[in-house]
Amino acid sequence: MDAATPGNGIISDVVFVIEGTANLGPYFESLRKHYLLPAIEYFNGGPPAETDFGGDYGGTQYSLVVFNTVDCAPESYVQCHAPTSSAYEFVQWLDSIKFMGGGGESCSLIAEGLSTALQLFDDFKKMREQIGQTHKVCILICNSPPYLLPAVESTTYSGYTTENLVQKIGERGIHFSIISPRKLPALRTLFEKAMPVGLIEPQPKDYSQDPRHMILVRGMVLPVGGATSVPGVMPPKQHISQPPLPVVPPQIASAPSHQLPPVQPPYMQVPQQSTLTPAHAAAHSAVEAAKNQKNSPSNRFLLPNLNPMPNAPAVGTPFNQPPAPTLPPNASVPKMVPSPSSLMTPASQSSLITTVTTGPGPAPVQLQQQGAPQQPVPPSMPITGAVGGVQAPQPSQPQIGTVQLPCTQTPVNGNKLLAWSGVLEWQEKPRSVSVDNNAKLTRSLPCQVYINPGENLKTDQWPQKLIMQLIPQQLLTTLGPLFRNSRMVQFHFTNKDLESLKGLYRIMGSGFAGCVHFPHTTPCEVRVLMLLYSSKKKIFMGLIPNDQSGFVNGIRQVITNHKQVQMQKIDQQRNMGAVQGVGAGSVPANSQGFLQKQPGTLPVGQAVSQQMQGQQVAPGMPSISQVAMMDEQQRSQNLLHIRVQQPQQLASQAPPQATQSSVQAPGQPQNPQPGAMLRPQNPGANPQLRNLLLSQQPPQSSVPQTQQPLHHMQQAAQSMLPHQAMGQQMQHQAPGQLQLPGQSLMHQTPAQQWGNQMQQRAPIPGTLMMSAGPRGPVPQSGLQQVQAQSVMEDDILMDLI
């Protein structure tokens, strides 16, 4: 087959014809490594070196032709490099090829490339006139069949089809070879038609390093294909025999950290083998499994878990029965059952992180499935017994979880550099229902920060402990540009505290991000670091924004906007609750803070107790339609803007009495509204005073709305003490109202109970309180309301500021 070898001293003319489209791009690196570089070494007599030159005419000449498809117009169909005698320079030409275009084409312009190659051989013939006969080789590297079109760009061979050109190549004694990542019948036909005249070829050798490659060679020698001759690839027998060796029971009984790691290297190498078919591999695995079952009686409880295909759906059923108490309350059992497709890929090893965080129970099953994914098992064997046999010993479960996390995270950090090591601390709400809502549970985990090689991150000034605060990821959607302009590091956590690690996975996987704030006392360039969890890659990534000040301001603005939205939602819920109260048969609630307007008297303590019992309508109350009409009449006359002088005018017309909204008929209880002023009633109230007050309302005052409530309070404070009796109830101020100087604040927070807070007490001398004297209603719209803020957001905002 090979007419010349490097030791014979025969000079060669070599032309590489390569398809320069994106169809070949993904495969070119593999073809270059396994076939092109060995071919160059064959013609060069050794590896290419920068100082190797065979002379302009005396040594081996290399030339490169790159052809495309018809979609490359208006560019030329072919790019040609002039011949060179330097193998090193030729390799640089190969590395500079840009594989692009051809995505919408199923064929390529092979005829254009071969016609240009024939022109190059014509030029070689003129250059070699003084040397004589040379060894001529044309190598075609492509991944698509040829167009049924003749060559058009070549001047000498214009009009020749691809078959005509390969026949021309064979007639001129040029050895034609084809290297393709796919077995294409059209290319094999070209190889057969390019056979030199009068040459009887022996049985071709198999040079393919991958069973999918088609390697048809003439005129040169390549390394023989197969897994045994490729450096770094283990023989097939070692691939098949190693996966069944690690078994879970020895790991549980002994040290699991020494048994589990050998599973991964042979499993990662299984896709590299190319000589055994899947059927042979499965048969060999079945034989090995039978031997292990015979030698180790304890394995019979675990062998049913080795078949991921037919029994995978049945594995999920026992998980909900006996091992359920070992899972966290929010564990998602379906996540523990991997799909058959994920078990057959090496990338599925990283999915063990999710399995450990959701619960350590089913972990041995997944380990066995990954260790030997091709071992068949009779369907009649009980799956439930297998799972129960593995999970019965409770002390063994933390050991299995302890083994899995480092093994799954170690490959991620294999090519990264350790930049910082310390402790990460955060707070989360306890999962117990009986615990106070404001209670916080502090957790911490040892962690390491890794960076990519070549990155420069100064961590020598970082504190030993990083404090992380949780923030919902939905609040960070507006900070996308700041996230994109950031550096990325990787966090790796040590699983010394398995409970804290599971809690971190649970929180970060449920829509929260970690805001790591560096204190100002630390002399480092980083102030804020965002910790995010990638559920797709199963890793924790840290984003360090380049614009630190802009990022801090952005988070501050996001939190401010979020609080404003929350306040608006709370106000809307209050209004909706008032409307729903009317529809349910309760006394209509005035959303603007008015007092109730039904005539009658009722002690304050009884009114408060009725209010806390759901605001039920008492016997003898007016109908809902009448109350609604009174509400509408009050709104129409704008009682929010009563002048300061109104109480004085009313005092001249009627004796001291209760306000218009609190006058009720005898025997009719009052149902106060939350946020209204509660005060004792005047026994001498006139039932017909309401109509008098509504008919004599003066026009709107020019006093600003925001100042009117204060005028009312000042006017009432001047005449409070003479009207307040020893047995009267002290007044209640609505939540959220401002407190006057010297005024005692008597309101309750929403989280407190009213039960024992309404005892009667004597007035405190020197203290100004809201009296029961005649005055207008006290509106709430002009008073400032302060909404309680969540503890988590306050902590974040305080630390960021």
Curated annotation (Swiss-Prot):
It is found in: Nucleus. Keywords: Activator, Nucleus, Transcription, Transcription regulation. One of its GO terms (cellular component) is transcription regulator complex. The keyword Transcription regulation applies. A motif (LXXLL motif) lies at residues 689-693. Residues 647-676, 687-710, 722-735 have a biased composition (Low complexity). Residues 647-735 are annotated as: Disordered. Gene3D superfamilies: Mediator complex subunit 25, ACID domain. Its main location: nucleus. InterPro entries: Med25_PTOV, Med25_PTOV_sf, Mediator_Med25_SD1, Mediator_Med25_VWA, VWF_A, vWFA_dom_sf. Pfam families: Med25 (PF11232), Med25_SD1 (PF11235), Med25_VWA (PF11265). SUPFAM superfamilies: vWA-like. One of its GO terms (biological process) is positive regulation of transcription by RNA polymerase II. PANTHER family: MEDIATOR OF RNA POLYMERASE II TRANSCRIPTION SUBUNIT 25. Component of the Mediator complex. Component of the Mediator complex, a coactivator involved in the regulated transcription of nearly all RNA polymerase II-dependent genes. Mediator functions as a bridge to convey information from gene-specific regulatory proteins to the basal RNA polymerase II transcription machinery. Mediator is recruited to promoters by direct interactions with regulatory proteins and serves as a scaffold for the assembly of a functional preinitiation complex with RNA polymerase II and the general transcription factors. Belongs to the Mediator complex subunit 25 family. This is Mediator of RNA polymerase II transcription subunit 25. It comes from Xenopus laevis (African clawed frog).
